[in-house]
Amino acid sequence: MEENFFKLILITNKQQISVEEYLDFVCACVQSGVTSVQLREKELSYRELLGFGEALKSILDPLEIPLIVSDSVSVCLDLDATGVHLGQTDGDVIEARELLGSDKIIGWNVNTLDQLLNANTLPIDYLGLSAMFATQNKPDATNLWGFSGLEQAVSLCEHPIVAIGGIDESNASKVIDAGAAGIAAIGVFHSAQNPSSVTKALREIVDRGLRC
């Protein structure tokens, strides 16, 4: 698996859009620079989630773009997805690693410094730092890391950090400069009038920052 799969992660938010139309949107973003897609659809049933996941894999697999499943090891296994992104209430990471084996990616979401320090001993591939800034997609976020919090987290963390929450073209450069290995986002992609253009701009920002 390419090490920089977490450079620019598109987190899904299909809502009422048809699957066909949404796949066109995802494909446009992937062709413009998204490096992996995170399946996050909390309103779907297990069966619906599998169906949507299979549809995503049908366009992502030929392009060798990883599909990461939010919250569920079982969905990851049933889809044979590339990996899983787990939150603090989504089960035991060590057990997840035993179930998934060494070939699957595991991301672990943290909201506090204590959680981050604990993550240093866990068998994960990257750490999701959430939320960076205020965002409509995480209205209940009680801790916003901001740039200084991200810098502190990077200095203390043993894993690559993917910054999540409220990131767009206006702040992505500073996020990478503060030490993030990548960014994951919902709103900046889904609210864009031209998703391809926004994706290209974000990818250029990330690539430029990581080269420095």
Curated annotation (Swiss-Prot):
Keywords tagged on the record: Magnesium, Metal-binding, Thiamine biosynthesis, Transferase
Name of the gene this protein is made from: thiE
Binding note for cofactor: Binds 1 Mg(2+) ion per subunit.
GO molecular function per UniProt: magnesium ion binding; thiamine-phosphate diphosphorylase activity
Taxonomic placement: Bacteria, Pseudomonadati, Chlamydiota, Chlamydiia, Chlamydiales
Pfam families per UniProt: TMP-TENI (PF02581)
PANTHER family from the UniProt entry: THIAMINE BIOSYNTHETIC BIFUNCTIONAL ENZYME, THIAMINE-PHOSPHATE PYROPHOSPHORYLASE
Name of this chain's protein: Thiamine-phosphate synthase
Species of the source: Chlamydia abortus (strain DSM 27085 / S26/3) (Chlamydophila abortus)
EC number in record: 2.5.1.3
Pathway(s) per entry: Cofactor biosynthesis; thiamine diphosphate biosynthesis; thiamine phosphate from 4-amino-2-methyl-5-diphosphomethylpyrimidine and 4-methyl-5-(2-phosphoethyl)-thiazole: step 1/1
